[in-house]
Curated annotation (Swiss-Prot):
Name of protein: HTH-type transcriptional repressor DasR
Compartments reported by the entry: Cytoplasm
GO molecular function (one): DNA binding
DNA-binding region per UniProt: 46-65
Pfam families listed in its UniProt record: GntR, UTRA
GO cellular component: cytoplasm
Database matches in PROSITE patterns: HTH_GNTR
InterPro entries (alphabetical): Bact_HTH_transcr_reg, Chorismate_lyase_/UTRA_dom_sf, Tscrpt_reg_HTH_GntR, UTRA, WH-like_DNA-bd_sf, WH_DNA-bd_sf
Entry superkingdom: Bacteria
Organism: Streptomyces griseus
UniProt keyword annotations, A-Z: Cytoplasm, DNA-binding, Repressor, Transcription, Transcription regulation
Length: 253
């Protein structure tokens, strides 16, 4: 039986009118405002918004906070709330952070937060195809775009496969360039997982966001042309400033 036959003669389900909360009407007004005003435009004070929409002062922060979380507004401590810049859009492909930012017309820079050796647990050993307890070079960097913090990136590589890599990075500003020129290793394929997380106090401090703000957490496992593991990377991106875009194509099967 087709879908039309399955519902023939059925009574339509009545749709009950829903009362629109005042904070939601305010939120829609602010959304329309962000579409017409340039980034950096200040939002009217909470008292003004409460009076204009005939709502309590406690209702206004709810609408503002939701728009901050969604990346439409930006709250600057001690200054107020402003229309946010458009989110940085990144296609899901096997490219470096530097390439991604330059494609957006932004200037990529990095700050080294930590570099050192750690011992591989069972999970990390499996990802890098080394023995449990093996040495792993761990590189943690703060990624910026035109001076604005965007992500915290933590890279793990086998110390056995890439001996003296830590010294090589003194000469090379790009990790992938060092891997290619010193070890003749290039990334060929990767599996990437995207999840959500909430900003920890440390992450919020480094990225300049509020504690508990939604983040985009990426895990990337990259291999070379022979299928040998190269790196495992965990990155935390600002959910209010970043979005990922995937181009999908229907299979031929």
């Amino acid at each position: 039986m087709g879908a039309e036959g399955a519902v023939r003669g059925a009574r339509p389900v009545p749709v009950r009118a829903q009362r629109v909360p005042k904070y939601y009407r305010l939120k829609r007004h602010l959304l329309d405002m962000t579409d017409t005003l340039p980034p950096g435009t200040p939002v009217p004070p909470e008292r003004t918004l409460a009076a204009e929409f005939d709502t309590s002062r406690t209702t206004v922060p709810q609408a503002l906070q939701e728009l901050v979380v969604e990346g439409r507004l930006e709250r600057i401590q001690g200054k107020g709330t402003f229309v946010a810049k458009p989110k940085v859009s990144q296609a899901l492909q096997l490219t470096s952070y530097t390439e991604d930012m330059r494609a957006q017309g932004l200037e990529p820079t990095s700050q080294l937060l930590d570099i050192g050796y750690v011992t591989a647990d069972d999970t990390l050993a499996g990802l890098l195809d080394i023995s449990t307890g093996g040495r792993v070079l761990r590189i943690e960097r703060l990624r910026l775009a035109s001076g604005e913090p965007m992500a915290i990136e933590t890279t793990h590589l086998s110390a056995k496969r890439f001996p003296a890599l830590r010294r090589s990075l003194v000469k090379y500003t790009s990790l992938y360039t060092a891997l290619a020129e010193v070890y003749d290793v290039r990334l060929a394929e990767a599996e990437e997982t995207i999840e959500t997380s909430l900003a920890t106090p440390r992450e919020a401090g480094l990225l300049g966001t509020d504690v508990g703000l939604p983040m985009l957490m990426l895990s990337r496992h990259s291999v070379d042309g022979q299928g040998e593991p190269v790196e495992w990377v965990r990155s935390v991106y600002r959910g209010d400033r970043y979005k990922f875009v995937a181009r999908l194509k229907r299979g031929t099967d």
